[in-house]
Swiss-Prot record:
Function: Carboxylesterase involved in the biosynthesis of the benzylisoquinoline alkaloid noscapine. Converts 3-O-acetylpapaveroxine to narcotine hemiacetal.
Pfam family, one: Abhydrolase_3
Residue numbers covered by motif Involved in the stabilization of the negatively charged intermediate by the formation of the oxyanion hole: 72-74
E.C. no: 3.1.1.105
Entries under Gene3D superfamilies matching the protein: alpha/beta hydrolase
GO molecular function, one term: hydrolase activity
Native organism: Papaver somniferum
Protein name: 3-O-acetylpapaveroxine carboxylesterase CXE2
Reactions that this protein is recorded to catalyse: 3-O-acetylpapaveroxine + H2O = narcotine hemiacetal + acetate + H(+)
């Protein structure tokens, strides 16, 4: 392809390391089943919380609901928690399971390169912990009254799957009690390396996620001067000081979702093997048909995916 920035409808200013985003991203306003909460004022991060629709919520409040801490996709550079594509997907999760979904509006690159998003993930985990401990003056009533802090899950899609993975590594070193992480859900997680895989080369000009666009996303997201063999991109590289070797101590179960039409599928299969070698019990749902992010666009596949997640939870 000619210009990956043209594909992304973005302009990068290398002097300021900022991105002008012209990509059309509609946002969805709040309704009675969603609310926005400030997470870190200094970092200008926030959370969008989803509950089941009112009529279903009234039925399910006789039992506590699982809490899903969710990280959206967008190559680390696009979208927010209120972006319609992410809002609708999280609302579907909250409705179908049912569950409380805490969607993290983390900082984007290149203005805030990795590990900024991982730091925001830690803030979100600590916020959920503080809710469980009742430490905050303005406790979030939905979590306080209806959330099951012993049944929490970390979930992410695409680059959000990468963030979810690294958040789980950091969680190993954290005292999260009373929060208990019951599992990790990685939906088409975004990883890479300098060495190309067969699926990388098979669909170089993939209509949804071309190779040149993936490379640019990593150039914008990774610390300056880093290659795609940085641990943030390539999980097979020696760990960055977090206890990835002890991952099974916290994350006993992991669901990896993928599609063979996704150019990232080889890396997702590699990730499954690595997690299994670390003692993590991994379940997979990998479909022959489908492309990167297809459940966000195809209602039928989304319904099937939600069924798999519900069974896992």
């Amino acid at each position: 392809m000619a210009d990956p920035y043209e594909f992304l409808m973005c302009i990068h200013d290398p002097e300021e390391d900022t991105l002008t985003r012209n990509f059309p991203i509609p946002a969805t306003p709040l309704d009675q089943n969603t609310k926005d909460i400030s997470l870190n004022l200094d970092r200008k991060t926030s959370l969008r919380i989803f509950r089941p629709p009112t009529e279903e919520f009234c039925v399910t409040t006789n039992k506590l609901l699982p809490i899903i801490i969710y990280f959206h996709g967008g190559g680390f550079v696009l979208f927010n928690a209120d972006s319609t594509i992410n809002h609708d997907f999280c609302q579907s999760i909250a409705t179908h399971l049912p569950a409380l979904v805490v969607s993290v509006d983390y900082r984007l690159a290149p203005e805030n390169r990795l590990p900024a998003a991982y730091d925001d993930a830690v803030d979100a985990l600590n916020w959920v912990k503080d809710q469980g401990l009742g430490k905050l003056n303005n406790s979030e009533v939905w979590l306080k009254e209806y959330g099951d802090f012993s049944k929490c899950f970390i979930m992410g899609c695409s680059s959000g799957g990468n963030i979810a993975y690294h958040a789980s590594l950091r969680a190993i070193e954290m005292d999260l009690e009373p929060v208990i992480i019951n599992g990790l859900i990685l939906h088409s997680p975004f990883f890479g390396s300098l060495q190309r895989t067969e699926s990388d080369l098979k669909v170089i000009n993939d209509q949804d996620l071309p190779l040149a666009v993936r490379d640019v996303m990593w150039e914008l997201a990774l610390p300056l001067g880093s290659s795609r063999d940085h641990v943030y991109c390539n999980p097979n590289i020696a760990n960055d000081g977090s206890s990835s070797g002890n991952m099974a101590g916290l994350i006993k179960r992991c669901l990896v979702i993928g599609f063979y039409g996704d150019p990232l599928i080889d890396r997702q299969i590699q990730l499954v093997k690595m997690l299994e070698e670390k003692g993590v019990k991994v379940e997979t749902w990998i479909e022959q048909e489908g492309y990167h992010g297809v459940p966000c666009f195809d209602p039928k596949i989304r319904e099937t995916l939600l069924g798999k997640i519900k069974y896992f939870i």
